Swiss-Prot record:
NCBIfam families: UTase_glnD. This is Bifunctional uridylyltransferase/uridylyl-removing enzyme. Gene3D superfamilies: Beta Polymerase, domain 2, cca-adding enzyme, domain 2, Nucleotidyltransferases domain 2. Residues 710-787, 817-888 form the ACT domain.
Length: 888
């Protein structure tokens, strides 16, 4: 028996036409839904068999045209059809319908009052059989008026296509629309340009986001459509082929953009087919499913599935890059044509380059062919003349792209070219603008083959929002911002350090090379350091600069690791880090590189808490490197130093030792005095002295110098307190970023916790602060240790599979450092706390670090008798309890 996929589904089939006229509306609707569903399934089968996307789109447009005409004829008599016109507009008008795309319709006429009920029935029927309908009912005058007021409406009319009804009315609409007074070419161009700029800004002006929108992101289908809209308004050209006839696009450019157009449409079709609904976002889970659907995943292992996603996304980024570059070239070309000056304003620069109407241009078209070095020289000119240059003329961009093949081994070995490349990074201004264009036009990838390998290389995790190459360009941008006075307010310390560097170019080159070895087998920081050293030697950098550059690439992960995972109040940890860094110069460069690196991963990664951690590590290490500093270098001296300073601060507030001596003595044997700063010790002491003591004392400091809300709990000692307060705070939907627990000799416990809300900011709302205090007091009194209900995993977290890694390191006879690396699931800390409780573990310190979908938490723990967890049996027991709770 034949199925719907074995024979051609047709809206003109007798059964559909018969059921359309059926007196039972349900029968009619059922038939309409069936013919639409069957057609979709038929197209999906063809798609899976490799049918071209061009054929599928044309077939879909033709099918929907026929279906709508039949439905139109059912609802309107011949006489009524003469009064109305059914017009396809928007994406449907240009014949670009995906399986679950909206269909945009215009019903045109002059007198709708009598026919209004039938129009409503017609549109309702379309909705009821499964169409998503966007429609407007207007007369000619209303159409033109609406189009004049809104460029989006005007653009929809630009793609109007007659379907049924009065054809003369449609021609009248076209004639009115084609009048030059209706959106003059230059006004339409400017409006579409502004529209595109706003759209790009919504996607951070980058096509290299890890979850792009196939349609709306830079380099997406909308960028191609913008070219065609402008071309149609200016030339009347309705296709890319016609643009070739007007000499606005070369044959090679046509082939590139047409191939990209078909590729993006194929991915979009696959996404609709996969999700069974309108969807244009390439979300992480979609990428995995599409990689499998499109045969990029024929290996079941976890690591290979990640490689399959990366293999699927790389051609997406390559095609989006082609679209973005050709969009830039063609819109610039249109601009030069549409805004043609009667007399060009020409300013010579040298025999090779000139500025025409504020746009940089070559003097002769054969410049790059005769003098390939000019491919680098042009970027020096961009830097030096940035105050006069708005951009590059379209023909010059084309010439750069067409001569990339000249950048070969001979070019790279030329002493002049090597010197020019370094000089680009040495310029006092315009480096970011130059490097962005070198990247966009393919110069960076051509000059540095290792950079070309990371172009379009995605990083399948939440921590990184961009591909490796785009992240690298953002790092260079953020490094440059440290030097600019107007941006000094963002990072005052970084600005002060940057402006005193002797060799800013080494810092920028470190940014260029820090991730250049990603995607290779091996530690990318080690492989990248080898690349950086080879580059330095080839480009004749002196030994000091070579050593500094390769060291920065090798150690670019160290600063962030120590800042976010180690106890920065421990002078021994600081001393160890200072010894690894070696000099203040290296520390300055490393701090700036790390700051720019982390800031360039994602907008969601950076917050005030991390900023303060970085500053604390920088300042503490600076003091450790200073041989004349009086800063203590061990824990005992640190505690004495902090107590003396805290006493001085308390004395200024009217408190003398007799007021707080008992409190201090109770915590003498803890790490309280060497792990809290003198200012913190003084403030905590004053808070506890001034407040009336209760069984459970809670104090909240909304904002602190640490960039987080401080929560102080002072109460009678209790086993498994960590398990209890982590559960309470998890119920309050807050994040713990650090917790310190001090058990005093007077049977009192002091807990200091630093909190952030889900937006990674301090908690300042008085109502929320009151709720936190009241909830904590109530729950701690109850000694409630029931696990909170587990929240579902967020969509972006759920897609990732991640093994849990647990490591133990004995610090001394009393303490063990426990490191847990796992997926950042909801309620993670509460689950860890429960495992501690079941294994009778006491927590002294917790440092919580979330990196995208990954949690990297460090705990200082002991037994309830204050002994380290050193036996293999006790470690294995705790490890198993943690795994059971985390992975259940």
């Amino acid at each position: 028996m034949a199925t719907t996929t074995d024979k051609q589904v047709s809206p003109t089939s007798p059964s559909f036409v018969y059921n359309l006229d059926h007196e039972d509306r349900n029968t009619s609707l059922k038939s309409g839904r069936a013919v639409l569903t069957d057609f979709n399934e038929q197209q999906f089968v063809k798609f899976d068999k490799g049918c071209s996307i061009e054929t599928l789109l044309k077939e879909r447009t033709s099918f929907i045209d026929q279906l709508l005409k039949k439905i139109w004829e059912h609802f309107f008599s011949k006489d009524e059809c003469e009064q109305l016109t059914l017009v396809a507009v928007g994406g449907y008008g240009r014949g670009e319908l995906q399986p679950y795309s909206d269909i945009d319709l215009l019903i045109l006429g002059e007198n709708f009052i009598e026919l209004q009920p039938k129009i409503v029935e017609f549109i309702t029927y379309l909705w009821d059989i499964g169409f998503e309908v966007g429609h407007a009912v207007r007369n000619l005058e209303d159409c033109i008026e609406a189009g004049r007021e809104d460029v989006t409406t005007a653009t929809n009319l630009l793609e109007a296509r007659w379907l049924a009804g009065n054809y003369e009315q449609f021609l009248s609409l076209q004639n009115l629309f084609n009048l030059k007074s209706f959106w003059p070419s230059h006004e339409f161009f400017q409006a579409k340009l502004e529209e595109q700029e706003k759209r790009h800004k919504r996607y951070n002006d980058t096509l290299y986001q890890l979850e792009p929108n196939i349609k709306e992101s830079p380099g997406g289908l909308r960028d191609i459509q913008t070219i065609l809209w402008v071309a149609k308004r200016h030339f009347g050209a309705s296709s890319l082929q016609e643009l070739m006839q007007h000499n606005f696009i070369s044959l090679q450019e046509y082939k590139e953009i047409q191939a990209a157009y078909l590729y993006l449409n194929r991915i979009r079709f696959a996404l609709h087919r996969l999700k069974k609904r309108h969807e244009d976002r390439l979300l992480f889970d979609h990428q995995q499913q599409l990689a499998e659907l499109l045969n990029h995943d024929d290996r079941p292992e976890h690591n290979d599935s990640i490689k399959a996603v990366e293999a699927f996304m790389k051609p997406y980024y390559q095609n989006a890059h082609i679209v973005a570059r050709l969009n830039e070239i063609l819109l610039q070309h249109f601009k030069e044509e549409i805004y043609h000056f009667a007399e060009d304003k020409i300013e010579p620069i040298n025999p090779r380059f000139r500025i025409i109407n504020n746009y940089l241009d070559v003097v002769k078209e054969n410049l790059f062919a005769k003098n390939p070095t000019a491919l680098l020289e042009i970027f020096i000119i961009i830097e030096n003349y940035q105050h006069l240059i708005q951009g590059i003329r379209s023909r010059t961009i084309r010439l750069i792209r067409n001569h990339l093949h000249l950048i070969d081994d001979q070019f790279r070995s030329d002493p002049i070219n090597k010197a020019l490349f370094i000089e680009i990074f040495r310029q006092p201004k315009g480096v970011n603008a130059a490097v962005k264009r070198m990247y966009a036009y393919g110069i960076l990838g051509a000059y540095l083959p290792s950079f070309k390998k990371i172009t379009g290389l995605m990083q399948f995790n939440i921590f990184h929002a961009y591909t490796v190459d785009e992240h690298t360009i953002l790092v260079i941008r953020n490094l440059r911002r440290f030097f600019i006075k107007q941006h000094a307010y963002e990072f005052p310390t970084a600005h002060q350090i940057a402006t005193q560097l002797c060799k800013p170019e080494i810092l920028l080159l470190a940014g260029l090379f820090h991730d250049i070895a990603k995607g290779r087998n091996g530690a990318h920081e080690k492989l990248g350091a080898v690349d950086a050293k080879a580059f330095s030697q080839k480009h004749n950098l002196n030994k000091n600069d070579t050593d500094l550059l390769s060291w920065l690439v090798l150690r670019h992960l160290d600063f962030s690791y120590v800042a976010q995972k180690k106890d920065l109040s421990d002078p021994e940890i600081i001393q160890q880090f200072a010894e690894k860094v070696g000099t203040q110069q290296r520390l300055d460069y490393l701090y700036l590189l790390t700051l720019a690196d982390v800031r360039s991963t994602s907008d969601e990664v950076w917050n005030d808490w991390k900023n303060q951690l970085f500053l604390q590590l920088y300042h503490n290490t600076t003091q450790a490197l200073d041989s004349s500093s009086s800063q203590p270098r061990d824990r005992v001296k640190q505690a004495i130093f902090n107590k003396e300073k805290a006493s001085e601060l308390l004395k200024k507030r009217g408190l003398i030792p007799m007021h707080f001596q008992g409190f201090w003595q109770a915590f003498e044997q803890t790490d309280f005095f060497n792990r809290q700063s003198a200012a913190e010790i003084a403030r905590i002491t004053r808070v506890l002295f001034e407040e009336d003591h209760e069984a459970i004392n809670i104090h909240l400091q909304p904002t602190t110098s640490r960039g987080a809300t401080e929560l102080i709990i002072y109460m009678h000692d209790r086993d498994y307190l960590f398990a209890q307060f982590t559960q309470i705070i998890d119920k309050l939907d807050l994040n713990i970023v650090e917790a310190k627990i001090y058990s005093g000799e007077d049977d009192m416990t002091l807990v200091i916790i630093y909190l952030l809300n889900r937006e990674s900011t301090s908690i300042t709302d008085p109502m929320i602060l009151t709720e936190i205090e009241e909830t904590l007091k109530h729950q701690l009194f109850l000694k409630d240790d029931t696990m909170p209900p587990t929240q579902p995993e967020p969509r972006r977290i759920r897609v990732f599979e991640m093994p849990t890694h647990i490591q133990f390191q004995e610090i001394n006879e009393e303490l063990t450092e426990l490191s847990i690396s796992t997926k950042d699931i909801p309620g993670l800390l509460a689950k860890i706390g429960q495992a501690f409780k079941s294994c009778k573990i006491r927590v002294h310190d917790a440092k919580i670090n979330t990196v995208g979908e990954k949690a990297e938490d460090t705990f200082m723990i002991s037994s309830t008798t204050n002994e380290s967890i050193h036996t293999r049996h006790s470690q294995e027991e705790l490890k198993q309890a943690l795994l059971n709770n985390i992975e259940q």
